[in-house]
Amino acid sequence: TRVPQGGRIRLTIEDKDVDFRVSCLPLMGEEKVVMRVLDTTKGVLTLEQLGFAASSMDLVKKNIDKTVGIILVTGPTGSGKSTTLYSIMHMLNNEGVNIVTLEDPVEYFIHGINQSQIRPDIGFTFAAGLRSLLRQDPDIMMVGEIRDNETAELAIHAALTGHLVMSTLHTNDAIGAIPRLIDMKIEPFLLSSVMDLIVAQRLARRLCQYCKREKAMPEEVVTDVKAKLSKIKPEILARYLPDYGQKPMMFYEPVGCDRCNKTGYKGRVALIEALDVNDFIRESILKDN
């Protein structure tokens, strides 16, 4: 092929329905293909299984109980944002609750949730879909991604009219979602009134639990870690790192064994930053600070 292509393939392999998202890029004399493999039979994981700490899960539960407002999940492409939203929707998926989604594409089918896949090629964009969703009497709306000003404005409007809206953004950290939306021409006073929770995440390779090896941290890393931890209030540090300062800092390094195909890694783990938009942050947004 002479142009980039993308698509989706669904196969049944050993009685498992497996989805492949394929991206092809033409190079000089060859073609580069990247495939993302989605095992649809695994079902939706819980937040705990995804790697959320108890404190982060508490923030999510507190904010989804409000039934109105906006919850955003941010991070780069392939960081597991959609997987986190599926987990949250699964928590909210109860009889009598009308959950409607706009996705690109629908990655997992969840019984009881009304899932719709956008088609930009025929004009069915996130913005066009959101307008229709508002007439579908939804309780909860999930928009796969806020990509432009129009989608952002419609999501804000939906939250202001009594809906819980969940979506994703591409930002480097949680707090970065706020200036990103302001850059999309969202008025700060509107943003401060509807934004409730922002979750930023990354995916890291998980060390193989069978062959990982403990190793002392290099001195320069210890110095850097101590400098960063010194900025944290002592009571918070004691809560999350009760043994800090009582023994040498250690970490684990990959080794490789038959269970991990000699790579030293098996699976991935989510690194989560959950930002509860409290009154202080709301006031800062209003001051555009």
Residue ranges and their predicted role:
Residues 1-289:
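Short, flexible helix-loop junctions that flank or precede catalytic/ligand sites
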